[in-house]
Regions:
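C-terminal alpha-helical "lid/dimerization" subdomain adjacent to the S-adenosyl-L-methionine
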Residues: 25, 108-151, 155-168
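C-terminal lobe and adjacent flexible extensions of AdoMet/dcAdoMet transferase-like proteins
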Residues: 169-187
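Class I SAM-dependent methyltransferase SAM/SAH-binding core
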Residues: 10-12, 16-65
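A short acidic, Gly/Pro-enriched loop at the edge of an enzyme's catalytic core
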Residues: 64-75
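Short glycine-centered segments of the SAM/dcSAM-binding site in methyltransferase folds
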Residues: 8, 104-106
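Conserved alpha-helix/loop element of class I SAM-dependent methyltransferases that forms part
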Residues: 1-5
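A short glycine-rich, Lys/Arg-flanked "PGG" loop and its adjoining helix->strand segment in the class I
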Residues: 91-103
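A short SAM/SAH-binding and catalytic strip from SAM-dependent methyltransferases
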Residues: 75-88
């Protein structure tokens, strides 16, 4: 993921800050904000950032109610969050990501996807046991890319797979101009 100095990046479901810290380490000139609903986890993230003197802000909040202005980020990232969300919450969270992204901004999601083989179907069982069969079903059925496109994003690409192919890496772009017939977060 290419980022330019001065860009603003939001990490939705930042947890202990691992992804936010990695982004800041690789791109020290970007402004990184993490958001997570767990205060104890955010305290850990803040300590980790202070320990390495990384200027990262961590905010308390939810993916489906982002406390940020419209068009305030150049990139929105999320790692292993969406498979925890109920289908209707996934939709609202994607609309919120769309809302806070600037036109031309990119969404990057790493999350459990549709298994492509019998081995992968077996490999996702621990995710399903830990996170619940209902929560993960939507992702395993391959619905996340459809939801991303239905939200109004363009240029959706699966850019790779990691963790034995269980986790899909998706990239999509908020259009610079939205047409009247395009489904957006406001429709």
């Amino acid at each position: 993921m290419r980022m330019l100095s001065g860009q603003h990046v939001l990490d939705i479901g930042s947890g202990t800050g691992t992804l936010a810290l990695l982004i800041k380490e690789k791109h020290p000139g970007v402004d990184v904000v993490g958001i997570d609903p767990d205060t104890q986890i955010l305290e850990i993230a803040s300590r980790k950032a202070r320990r390495v003197r990384a200027d990262i802000r961590f905010d308390l909040g939810y993916a489906d109610r982002l406390p940020y202005s419209d068009s305030s980020f150049d990139r929105v990232v999320s790692s292993l969050v969406f498979h925890h969300l109920a289908p209707e919450t996934k939709v609202v969270a994607l609309r919120e990501a769309w809302r806070v992204l600037r036109p031309g901004g990119e969404l990057h999601i790493a999350d459990v996807g549709r298994p492509r083989s019998a081995l992968m179907r077996v490999a996702v069982i621990p995710f399903r046991l830990f996170d619940g069969f209902g929560a993960t079903e939507h992702n395993l059925a391959g619905r996340l890319p459809d939801l991303i496109m239905e939200t109004g994003f363009d240029d959706l690409a699966e850019t790779g797979r990691v963790m034995l192919g269980i986790v899909c890496l998706y990239r999509a772009v908020k259009p610079r101009v939205t047409s009247g017939n395009r489904r957006t977060s406001h429709n």
